[in-house]
Amino acid sequence: MVGSSNETKDPLTVVPRAQGFHFYKAIGGCIGVTCCSLEELADALQKVCSEAVIFHFERGDFQNWIRDIIGDNELAQRIDDVKMCSRQLSGEACRKELVERINVRILQLEVAKGPSVFG
Protein backbone atom coordinates (compact mmCIF):
# COMPACT_ATOMS: atom_id res chain seq x y z
CA MET A 1 0.00 0.00 0.00
CA VAL A 2 1.44 3.31 -1.04
CA GLY A 3 -0.04 5.97 1.10
CA SER A 4 0.66 9.36 2.48
CA SER A 5 -1.69 8.95 5.43
CA ASN A 6 1.25 8.30 7.75
CA GLU A 7 2.73 11.67 6.79
CA THR A 8 -0.15 13.49 8.48
CA LYS A 9 0.06 11.57 11.76
CA ASP A 10 1.88 12.87 14.82
CA PRO A 11 3.92 9.93 16.14
CA LEU A 12 3.80 11.44 19.64
CA THR A 13 0.02 11.29 19.78
CA VAL A 14 -1.96 8.99 22.05
CA VAL A 15 -4.20 6.69 20.01
CA PRO A 16 -7.58 5.37 21.15
CA ARG A 17 -7.38 2.20 23.26
CA ALA A 18 -9.02 0.19 20.47
CA GLN A 19 -6.01 1.05 18.27
CA GLY A 20 -3.51 0.47 21.06
CA PHE A 21 -0.83 -2.20 21.10
CA HIS A 22 -2.14 -5.21 23.03
CA PHE A 23 0.51 -7.53 24.44
CA TYR A 24 0.16 -11.32 24.14
CA LYS A 25 2.43 -14.21 25.13
CA ALA A 26 0.97 -16.39 22.40
CA ILE A 27 -2.07 -16.51 20.12
CA GLY A 28 -5.02 -16.05 22.47
CA GLY A 29 -2.70 -15.38 25.41
CA CYS A 30 -3.45 -11.72 26.17
CA ILE A 31 -1.53 -10.49 29.21
CA GLY A 32 -3.73 -7.43 29.80
CA VAL A 33 -1.23 -4.71 28.85
CA THR A 34 -2.22 -2.14 26.24
CA CYS A 35 -0.13 0.80 25.03
CA CYS A 36 -1.59 3.84 23.32
CA SER A 37 1.60 5.80 22.63
CA LEU A 38 5.29 5.31 21.96
CA GLU A 39 6.07 6.38 25.51
CA GLU A 40 3.71 3.74 26.91
CA LEU A 41 5.22 1.13 24.59
CA ALA A 42 8.77 1.88 25.78
CA ASP A 43 7.60 1.68 29.40
CA ALA A 44 5.68 -1.57 28.88
CA LEU A 45 8.59 -3.22 27.06
CA GLN A 46 10.64 -2.82 30.24
CA LYS A 47 7.97 -4.54 32.36
CA VAL A 48 6.24 -7.26 30.35
CA CYS A 49 7.46 -10.85 30.37
CA SER A 50 10.15 -11.78 27.88
CA GLU A 51 7.77 -14.27 26.22
CA ALA A 52 5.54 -11.37 25.17
CA VAL A 53 8.46 -9.34 23.84
CA ILE A 54 9.76 -12.30 21.83
CA PHE A 55 6.28 -13.24 20.56
CA HIS A 56 5.64 -9.80 19.09
CA PHE A 57 9.21 -9.15 17.99
CA GLU A 58 9.41 -12.33 15.92
CA ARG A 59 6.06 -11.58 14.24
CA GLY A 60 6.97 -7.98 13.39
CA ASP A 61 4.07 -6.66 15.44
CA PHE A 62 5.98 -3.72 16.94
CA GLN A 63 7.07 -2.44 13.53
CA ASN A 64 3.60 -2.88 12.05
CA TRP A 65 1.88 -0.99 14.89
CA ILE A 66 4.46 1.79 14.86
CA ARG A 67 4.21 2.13 11.07
CA ASP A 68 0.47 1.65 10.55
CA ILE A 69 -1.11 3.09 13.72
CA ILE A 70 1.45 5.52 15.12
CA GLY A 71 2.60 6.59 11.64
CA ASP A 72 6.35 6.57 12.20
CA ASN A 73 8.02 4.81 9.29
CA GLU A 74 11.49 5.83 10.47
CA LEU A 75 11.13 4.17 13.87
CA ALA A 76 9.55 1.10 12.29
CA GLN A 77 12.65 0.78 10.10
CA ARG A 78 14.91 1.14 13.13
CA ILE A 79 13.02 -1.74 14.78
CA ASP A 80 13.37 -3.75 11.56
CA ASP A 81 17.12 -3.16 11.81
CA VAL A 82 17.13 -4.69 15.31
CA LYS A 83 15.22 -7.67 13.97
CA MET A 84 17.81 -8.22 11.25
CA CYS A 85 20.60 -8.53 13.84
CA SER A 86 18.49 -10.20 16.54
CA ARG A 87 20.14 -13.59 16.12
CA GLN A 88 23.21 -12.05 17.72
CA LEU A 89 21.28 -10.59 20.67
CA SER A 90 19.92 -12.29 23.78
CA GLY A 91 16.27 -11.73 24.65
CA GLU A 92 17.11 -9.11 27.26
CA ALA A 93 19.61 -7.37 24.97
CA CYS A 94 16.93 -7.24 22.30
CA ARG A 95 14.42 -5.75 24.78
CA LYS A 96 16.99 -3.14 25.81
CA GLU A 97 17.73 -2.28 22.17
CA LEU A 98 14.02 -1.83 21.39
CA VAL A 99 13.47 0.43 24.40
CA GLU A 100 16.55 2.49 23.59
CA ARG A 101 15.55 3.01 19.96
CA ILE A 102 12.01 4.01 20.92
CA ASN A 103 13.22 6.45 23.59
CA VAL A 104 15.79 8.02 21.25
CA ARG A 105 13.08 8.48 18.63
CA ILE A 106 10.71 10.06 21.15
CA LEU A 107 13.41 12.58 22.06
CA GLN A 108 14.09 13.33 18.39
CA LEU A 109 10.40 13.91 17.74
CA GLU A 110 10.05 16.15 20.80
CA VAL A 111 13.05 18.26 19.75
CA ALA A 112 11.71 18.54 16.20
CA LYS A 113 8.32 19.60 17.54
CA GLY A 114 9.88 22.51 19.39
CA PRO A 115 9.49 23.88 22.90
CA SER A 116 6.29 23.19 24.74
CA VAL A 117 4.62 25.04 27.56
CA PHE A 118 4.10 23.12 30.77
CA GLY A 119 1.50 24.31 33.15
Task: Outline where the language-model segments fall.
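Terminal, compositionally biased segments used for targeting/anchoring and flexible tails
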Residues: 1-119
